[in-house]
């Protein structure tokens, strides 16, 4: 096997384990690593989004079999994701790379603080949206908003979807997380097409994304197995270490670029 392909397989396995073990978007691992390997921020995002197609599909199949996924909700959120992510190529082609990298760093830092201090979103006991029509509309709008920002930064949608759906629809996080993973299937496909249409990514990036994506499927499976045998304390320390390392590597690449 070519050493380049071998390294991509290792990256895919690692990001997949992160997704299965921590429930985090692969971008937290993939983007800093690809920046370190000399890829541009746009190409790193493109590779991260392509990887999401594979890991989110595999993860959603598992969630569906475990009856954790509401397909109806997922389709409406997915429609929004298709629409929102279609703008991601335009965003990456017009916004300065350094600004996007800083925003990625801020979001990673927020995630670190959230888990370090065990900050949890409260579910609205009396959600303002009761009508089924408006509930579906909220799902679509949430998908659009999340698709625009999350795919443009190569991150999962849970960080944005959990507080929005928790407030307006009263959804608990354990219901939103599988929904967010299913949403990523739609938004990542739309985002990849948008990246291609705006010449953000090329054939080499597509091939790299496929290698990493296929390897991430095995990584997700391994991550799920690992979480079953690890203690909560070890899981928490490992999660914070990954976020901390991601911030350090991203900040280093930002300063030296």
Features from the language model and the residues they span:
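Juxtamembrane transmembrane-helix boundary motif
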Residues: 1-15, 35-37, 41, 62-153, ...
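Single transmembrane alpha-helix segments in multi-pass membrane proteins
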Residues: 14-28, 170
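Transmembrane helix-bundle signature of multi-pass membrane transporters/permeases
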Residues: 16, 45-53, 82, 177-188, ...
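Residue-level signal for conserved functional micro-sites within the alpha-helical transmembrane segments
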Residues: 19, 52-55, 59, 81, ...
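Residue-level recognition of specific faces of alpha-helices
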Residues: 20, 33, 43-46, 164
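Transmembrane helix boundary and interhelical junction motifs in multipass membrane proteins
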Residues: 22-30, 154-164
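Alpha-helical transmembrane segments of polytopic integral membrane proteins
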Residues: 27, 31, 47-50, 54, ...
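Alpha-helix capping/termination and helix-coil
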Residues: 169, 186-197
């Amino acid at each position: 096997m070519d050493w380049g392909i071998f390294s991509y397989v290792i990256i895919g396995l690692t990001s997949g384990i992160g997704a299965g073990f921590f429930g985090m978007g692969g971008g937290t691992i993939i983007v800093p690593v690809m920046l370190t390997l000399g890829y541009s921020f746009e190409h790193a995002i493109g590779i991260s989004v392509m990887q999401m197609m594979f890991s989110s599909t595999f993860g959603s199949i598992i969630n569906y079999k475990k009856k954790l996924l509401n397909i109806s909700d997922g389709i409406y959120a997915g429609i929004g994701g298709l629409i929102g992510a279609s703008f991601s190529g335009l965003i990456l082609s017009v916004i300065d790379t350094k600004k996007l990298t800083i925003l990625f760093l801020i979001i990673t830092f927020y995630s670190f603080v959230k888990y370090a201090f065990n900050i949890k979103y409260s579910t609205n006991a009396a959600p303002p949206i009761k009508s089924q029509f408006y509930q579906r509309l909220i799902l679509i709008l949430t998908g659009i908003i999340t698709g625009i920002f999350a795919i443009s930064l190569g991150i999962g949608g849970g960080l944005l979807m959990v507080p929005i759906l928790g407030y307006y629809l009263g959804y608990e996080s354990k219901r939103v997380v599988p929904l967010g993973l299913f949403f990523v299937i739609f938004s990542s496909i739309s985002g990849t097409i948008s990246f291609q249409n705006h010449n953000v990514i090329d054939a080499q990036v597509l091939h790299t994304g496929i290698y990493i994506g296929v390897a991430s499927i095995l990584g997700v499976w391994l991550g799920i197995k690992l979480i079953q045998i690890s203690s909560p304390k070890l899981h928490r320390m490992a999660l914070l270490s990954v976020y901390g390392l991601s911030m350090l590597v991203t900040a280093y690449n930002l300063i030296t670029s």
